[in-house]
């Protein structure tokens, strides 16, 4: 008997009806609506460790982790206690506080960044970093990569995530907006290339390098499914600085997840600026950007590039971030544990898919993993065009099979899942059993 048979979704259905009456689409972030997989989104009532409990009382083994922040697991006691202690002193001051200094010092220590500035989201972090790069260089064009998602600022909603659009013929890097409401004039300042195409990047920089303020990239892509960079591509990225462009690593997803120094540490990167979010706030709304002092000192009030925020450095969010990073720093073996779990999960999923006769290609790095429903060798999906060849209907059927068996997977073919410290042997066994049954329900 499946979870869907023992726990009807009446409460979630009723909440979804109410939500649609007052909120566009009934959700506050589009992927939560289950549009690409069908069915009723689960309204969550509580979370603990590796598990979620929905409004109807059904319990799910969670592989979303609030889309990345919950690397320690949900409601971790150290984080909860730190927030409770901070709460006793007030919720927001609109003034400097000691905790923001302490969290900045931790980030500097763990990442090597020379300066850090806090904001309230990953979108704010990338938006601010690009404004800073333009102010520092005096240039206006930026370069991003097809399928890389950097938040929902107008200039970044250009061929972002699943919003793939055809490149304009004859104009290297030209692209169109991924969303209504983004003027073409904004999109015209964003040049888009294929991820993992070093030749195209070299060609663009040779052609227009003196116009480029910044090149922004995800070291590991997560919003087109997990895409892993090649060494040649990483080398080409670092060459953009020869043209005076600022190299910005968007580590909102990978920061503190792939290592204590994020993808920068794992992949031996050397960006000028980095953007963080998710884990850095321990589950509360925090973003940050930082890097070279000579660039960061252009930020107001030190320099001429304005950026501000009412809730930047919020004491509750800072407390959660400090507690999370302290736990990670105190447990350096955690990253090996997460990687081993992901490797065993990938191997088990591969075997289950083969036994069911379902074609899949699995990408994973550290605690991030995507199962692409397509007939290709594992690790061979390297750019958005390859990811887009996946069978989304087959994925949706598999997702529903998992959900019915109590596994809460990312509700999109083009997303990463996230493994936490709370995932152990019982969770791995339960996942592989449910996945095998769900694969049997996918029509070849």
UniProtKB/Swiss-Prot annotation:
PANTHER family: GLUTAMATE-1-SEMIALDEHYDE 2,1-AMINOMUTASE (PTHR43713), GLUTAMATE-1-SEMIALDEHYDE 2,1-AMINOMUTASE 1, CHLOROPLASTIC-RELATED (PTHR43713:SF3). It is found in: Cytoplasm. The keyword Cytoplasm applies. InterPro entries: 4pyrrol_synth_GluAld_NH2Trfase (IPR004639), Aminotrans_3 (IPR005814), Aminotrans_3_PPA_site (IPR049704), PyrdxlP-dep_Trfase (IPR015424), PyrdxlP-dep_Trfase_major (IPR015421), PyrdxlP-dep_Trfase_small (IPR015422). It comes from the Bacteria. Its cofactor is pyridoxal 5'-phosphate. This is Glutamate-1-semialdehyde 2,1-aminomutase. One of its GO terms (molecular function) is pyridoxal phosphate binding. Pathway: Porphyrin-containing compound metabolism; protoporphyrin-IX biosynthesis; 5-aminolevulinate from L-glutamyl-tRNA(Glu): step 2/2. It catalyses: (S)-4-amino-5-oxopentanoate = 5-aminolevulinate. GO terms for biological process: protoporphyrinogen IX biosynthetic process. Its main location: cytoplasm. It comes from Deinococcus radiodurans (strain ATCC 13939 / DSM 20539 / JCM 16871 / CCUG 27074 / LMG 4051 / NBRC 15346 / NCIMB 9279 / VKM B-1422 / R1). Homodimer. PROSITE patterns: AA_TRANSFER_CLASS_3 (PS00600). Its EC number is 5.4.3.8. Belongs to the class-III pyridoxal-phosphate-dependent aminotransferase family. HemL subfamily. The keyword Transit peptide does not apply. The modification N6-(pyridoxal phosphate)lysine is found at residue 278. One of its GO terms (cellular component) is cytoplasm. Keywords: Cytoplasm, Isomerase, Porphyrin biosynthesis, Pyridoxal phosphate.
